[in-house]
Amino acid sequence: MGGKAQFIRDFILKGPVRRTVPIEPVEPSTSGSIAWTSSESGSAHSSRVSSSPITPRKSAETEETLPTCLVRARGSSSAHSCSAATTSQQSNRQSKEHRIGGIKKEEKPIEMGGGSSENGGANGCSNGDNHHVLLMEKQEKIEPKVFRKRWVILVIFMFLSGSNGAQWIQYSIIANIISDYYKVSFQAVDWTSMIYMLTYILFFIPAAWLLDKWGLRLSVLLGALGNCVGAWIKLLSTHPDSFWVTFVGQTIVGASQMFTLGIPPRLAAVWFGPDEVSRACALGVFGNQLGIAVGFVLPPLIVSNGSVEHVTYDLNTLFLGSAVLNTSILALVICFFTARPAVPPSLAQVNALEEKTFDNNFWGTLRKLMTSRDFVILFITYGINTGVFYAISTLLSQMVLSVYPNETETVGYVGLLIVVAGMAGSVVGGFILDKFKKFKLTTIMIYLFSFVGMLSFTLTIDLDSMVLVFINAALLGFFMTGYLPIGFEFAAEITYPAAEGTTSGLLNASAQIFGIALTWLMGIVMHGFGTFTSNIIMSSCLVVGTILTCFIREDLKRQKAHSVQCTIPTSETQLTSCTLQQNEHF
């Protein structure tokens, strides 16, 4: 590949990162070969001694070259043994120290006996069901490190996710005005919201594969580009006969969601330390919720009912502001968003990088996830809770205006309160998880209070009191929206080391499936049988979700990986053993 082409490829996949001088491979000895290279990301490396040269394997996301693992447990009951060739007694003992992106490596020759042993011991290593052993000739001093830039990365993503969320609800919250202006039905207006869900269901698997294969930057870049293009197309739709144009623009923006919706847990794991990861994930979700809050408030304030000319002017203002904002965010992503830090922020991330190198089978991971009992239950319960939230958000204007017909602007504030309370719930939930690590208990309690909030909202909306509507909207939003990042983190724990982007992508797909089904069905029920009936059905769904959550087993595999134990027996053998508590991860 030419120099310019390689530079462009690296810039797209990794961003504006500093290049490091690669370390040349160590020359092989007569009895064995030692091979290792440095990576631009400074990730942990493993190496081995063998009778033949080592074939490195490449990880596309980081463009790092890593040797194949010496021993890899696959869940069989039998142990696997390995042996290393005897090195020359006259080999050079002078150690060399390199610093690669904050990771120190000391090269020392290995003196080991030949042969192997089934049970391990001095001359070999074994591998059983519950652990695997990495044999390395170099002592690695890996010091996980977090960088201040992680906050810049997180804030840029929050702006991107927020700009996408704001456009999701901008038509539905003024459904009566949009319906009159474009001369379309309320169901057509509802589809401007549901198209987000439909495009995600159709394309989330390719998007999850893209994130797993090529990393954060490319996914975020495509999401920002789609937001920008769709926003400018919608600016061309400010004419009563142009609903199809605005729908095309909204479809492009909705499709862009598939590149960003599953990012928060992946970004948190890649950039943040073990004591920050839940909060970082919560803040990533917080950005999307903040955008939805803006989508609830700004359209009713900017676009008011009136003549065709008046509505045209207001829509122009709304769409132009959105287009300029999304163009600015695209520029920020291009200039400042990088794929990963130079050094992994946690031991779990170091191990995840090695797992990705050894087992880079996206479809195999997908199959394992969908055959995991605990993940399948979480897949269903997450979809129920989030689907109910999507249905309420889309139908909120029609729910409230059916009882309070003159409160068009107030509806926007009700939606704002739901989302703002939910943002607070997301952050509080993240702090609780980081502090106490009680994932299952926290999930059950939030699910239970989501049901209480929904039931209270259902029973008070007809009491002719907007104060009660606001109070119950806050209660509903705090718990229901606060559930979103907690579900992501719970999934990351019980499926570790599966890529966080894959697990969150599946959870979001479940949310879109339930969301589109509940929005469509509850819209029919609401217009046919009334708001009370539709809300009771959604409350019943939350009861089912709460009960199902109790059957999820709390096996926090990622927390175990944070405390992985590494021992270096002697400087003579340089035999490094890393023992994990669990090998069959999910």
UniProtKB/Swiss-Prot annotation:
Keywords: Membrane, Transmembrane, Transmembrane helix, Transport
Position of the signal peptide: none
GO biological process assignments: heme export
Keyword Transferase in annotation: no
Membrane-topology descriptor: Multi-pass membrane protein
CDD domains: MFS_FLVCR_like (cd17398)
Disordered: annotated segments: 17-64, 80-123
GO molecular-function term, one example from the UniProt record: heme transmembrane transporter activity
PROSITE patterns, per database record: MFS
Biased composition (Low complexity): 38-52, 80-91
Places the protein is found: Membrane
Transmembrane regions: 151-171, 191-211, 218-238, 243-263, 283-303, 317-337, 375-395, 413-433, 441-461, 466-486, 513-533, 536-556
Comp. bias intervals (Gly residues): 112-123
Top-level taxonomic group: Eukaryota
Biased composition (Basic and acidic residues): 94-110
InterPro entries cross-referenced by the UniProt entry: FLVCR1-2_SLC49-like (IPR049680), MFS (IPR011701), MFS_dom (IPR020846), MFS_trans_sf (IPR036259)
Chief place of localization: membrane
GO cellular component terms given for this protein: membrane
Protein name according to UniProt: Uncharacterized MFS-type transporter C09D4.1
